Amino acid sequence: MRGFMASEPLTLRQRNVLRLLWLACLPASFVNTVFTQTATYAAAEFNVSERGQGFAAAIVRWGVVIALPFAFSADRFGRRKMIVAMSWLAPIVVSLGALSPSFGFLVATQTIGRPLGISLSIFIVVFATEEMGTNTRAWALSVLAVGSGVGAGSAVGALPLAGISDTSWRYVYIVGLLWLVVAVVLTRSLPETKRFIALQHQQHEETPSHHSAAVSAHIHRDRLWLQIAVAVLTNIFIATASVFQIRYLKDVRDYSASLVAVFTTITAIPASFGLMIGGRIADQRGRKNLAIVTIPLGAVLIATSYGFASYMMWLTAILGGICLGLAYPAMAVFRSELFPTAKRNIASAIITTASLIGGSIGLIGAGLLLDHDVSYATVMMGFAMGPVLVAVLVFTKYPETAHRKLEELNPEDSLLQIL
């Protein structure tokens, strides 16, 4: 069990914050998952074609741009306020899908609601990065990723409700209202991060003749563009491999719906262990060495699984999932470590927006190739070159951030008086 624990003890405040953020991950990931799980059932009720479903999925994915003004607000008015607001708004807006008189209305509610969940996820990661210790940031994100898996799993677990009748998929959206319990807990108990409080103190001391470097900090453009490139190259593969997996198993391997569910579950569980172990390794031994090995290896293994049948398909998918699970904490923590406190949320939101839009372009490209009878193995291996290039960029361009304070990585924050 030691391999799953943090590399150093957490303070009482850090433990409490991590518990609250873990709870916040539940509605965030439910909101981000529910449309994907129910779109087919809703489309059947409204007689929407597969092409229409694909177009709807792209619209919902591109709605991520809505997250940008919320991220700006989180940097301006506080992390706590926006996390609490999103924990209320996201489940409520998404649940409006249950009232849909048309497929277009459903898409509209999810185009607004899903970005609220994405915003919540971004703010959670930034909050954890700012509150955890120098040697526990990556591990904390691995814990939160497990929470996100539980929240997404709740959407999958509610899916049998969609099979009751042609219109019962609406019940799955109503289930999301149960997560308002989390909003109540966060409203009562979540504090503000110490770093944002220190930034606010600096803002109050601003005068025309005195400008704080922390308050007037800008996004490091070189770091931003680098992380956008890495996020897009990674998500083009991840999104394509995950979205087309069900279609591959169903059409090529002739798997039933039940067997698809078993395959998804069996291959995902080991990846969660990879998350926990990866977080500890990233904090103890560094992010870069872990990432440059596990990202390309995981992508190639998963791409290879599309060329195998029987047990080799399962084995390569499991091993690939473990590798990407190991890589996730290291890569996720980079997004918020490398930007100053005053711009941490908006920078993360810009990267996430680019990643999702890039991933949708990858989905369109993969769909065109597959429709022209290019094999799944060829398409996936071609897209896996994205993560291979990511490893090169991380090795040559990324700084090592393990064992370093955020203020060391972002010198403009060095004068913040963090209590």
Language-model features, listed with the residues they occupy:
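Symmetry-related core transmembrane helices of the 12-TM Major Facilitator Superfamily/SLC fold
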Residues: 170-187, 378-395
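Conserved MFS/SLC helix-loop-helix module at the cytosolic interface between two early adjacent transmembrane helices
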Residues: 66-101, 282-288
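Extracytoplasmic gate region of multi-pass secondary transporters
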Residues: 35-36, 220-275
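Cytoplasmic helix-loop-helix junction between adjacent transmembrane helices
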Residues: 109-146
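Glycine-rich segments within core transmembrane alpha-helices of 12-TM secondary carriers
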Residues: 136-164, 179, 349-363
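Central cavity-lining transmembrane alpha-helices of secondary-active solute carriers
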Residues: 57-72, 265-277
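Extracytoplasmic
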Residues: 16-50, 241-246
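Helix-breaking motifs and short loop linkers at transmembrane-helix boundaries and internal kinks
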Residues: 47, 78, 99-104, 133, ...
